[in-house]
Amino acid sequence: MNVLILGAGLMQIPAILSAKELGYRVCLVDADDKAIAISKADEFRKIDLKDKEGILQYAKSLQNGSGLAAVFTAGTDFSASVSYVCQKLNLPSHTFDAALNASIKTRMRKCFSDANVPSPQFFNLDKDNFTQDKLKEISSLIGFPLVVKPVDNMGARGCRMVRSLKEFEPAVKIAIEVSRSGNAIVEEYMDGPEYSIDALVYNGTFTVTGFALRHIKYPPYFIETGHTMPAELDKSVHNQLISVFALGAKALGLEKGAAKADIKFTKNGPMIGEIAGRLSGGYMSGWTYPYSSDLNLTKEALLIACGKEPEELIKNRQKVDFETSALCKNALQPYQLFEVKSKKVSAERAWMSIPGIVEEVKNITEEKIPYVKDFLPRTTVKLNCKVDFPRNNVQKCGNVISLAEDRKLAVEAAQNAVSNVFIGLKANTRETDDFLNFYTQDDEDNFPPSAFKSLSSQELAQIEGFIPQNQKISDFIPSVLKTSDYKKEVDWSFNTISDIAAKFDILRPHHPKLNAQKFWKAVLRGGLQAAVYISDSEK
């Protein structure tokens, strides 16, 4: 008996392993015939995940052959393709209509609005109604900042904050370009901490299977630098967030399968960013939640997709009280609410790069870091490839996952592992020089950001002279960078100024004579990568 999984990338590996554990033969489809998970499958077909009819024909051949137990995906945009095939073949899943509601953001927002589920005000734009007058009208109605997204994409691709009319038009153009349907959605900005929540919907029950705090940084983009599982929350806030997620899932029509929410807790209570009809990507459903809870969420989701009872889910879940906020105080409970709670803490953190061309990728020290479970570099980050400071979550360079009984230990382990990664860049390249010289696009004010706050011209003038050839940089940290303001400040790699100096001394014990002001200015702009780049460019 076969299980058909859409996608053959890293995010689908937990599903492949879980299906095999359940005794099924695993068949994969993906447009990329070099995808990394293909070798783990029993059969692979090169089919674009957008091609519903092509997937359906392949699924029919499996069903008519040795049998097809389920069609499944996790961490892709294509839950609607899953539901389309399942509905045609009478297999368990969300309905195709519900899956479309959970895939197309304008449909999603309308469902929320019709059901009075708290979510931002929105407008739809495409190339036909995209005019300056329309942009002015929208901005006058919801004000700045606002958010622009493609209606049908994930990974924050084409998604950004818009802070002025100058930024509005370029943002909409990009969102329309990366949208599969050529549509963008404009929303009011929601201010508040953001959470990712996974759940399984089954027989009128809604069981939360992962509740994480997302660490979103670097406006105008929404870059997830990591997440921590579980989130630490007041019980009432916790229950309100779950209750509003459940109301949103019900409004979309999700009844049989997985659901995943990105949701904020604003000054007015929970508001939904979006809900997908699938398990989350971003290492949550397949890594941090199973680690922290001891529950194989993917396996339980697959059991539902196979029409079987998710026994471990039912055995370990606890009741959650339905609790509404002022924005939906008259709402009726949509499902019976449960949660399988995390027992430990798992932290995921990402590492990133400043712009340039990769010359080396290495760990600064070979010392094993306690509590680190996974070290996951992106396959796209290799010698001679271009890297950039991320504008979406696909452009990050890698991820680390830790697990510990204690929150502080888990977080510190992940951060220490990230700080131990070094991506060296080719010397004297335009992209890196432009970054160090603060060149930015007109519609990206102050982006990419700096690693540390800049010195004033008077403070910079205090840094004089040269750092002698082959001398330890740690012995030449300027006094202006030893103040309390800089001692505890860390960059995106979780390094302080003194950390950077010590790591430079490990990476480049032999270096040329360096202009001190130029060197430390580069450190403030781009951290350790910039320090090594400046040194290498002087040779």
Language-model region placement:
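Active-site nucleotide/adenylate-binding loops and adjacent lid/helix of ATP-dependent enzymes
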Residues: I104-I185, D191, N203, A231-S243, ...
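Active-site "cap" helix and flanking loop/linker of ATP-utilizing ligase/carboxylase catalytic domains
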Residues: Q240-A261, K267, A276-E359
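ATP-binding N-terminal substructure of ATP-dependent carboxylate-amine bond-forming enzymes
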Residues: M1-A98, D128-F130, E309, N316-Q336, ...
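Glycine-rich active-site loop/lid that clamps phosphate-bearing ligands
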Residues: A350-L383
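Internal nucleotide-binding/catalytic subdomain
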Residues: C159-P270, A276-G281, Y291-S292
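Short amphipathic alpha-helical segments
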Residues: A156-G158, V345-A347, K396-V400
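Short, flexible turn/loop "capping" segments at secondary-structure junctions
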Residues: A37-I38, P150-D152, Y221-F222, G281, ...
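Short beta-strand-to-loop capping motifs
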Residues: K127, R163-S164, A199, W351-P355, ...
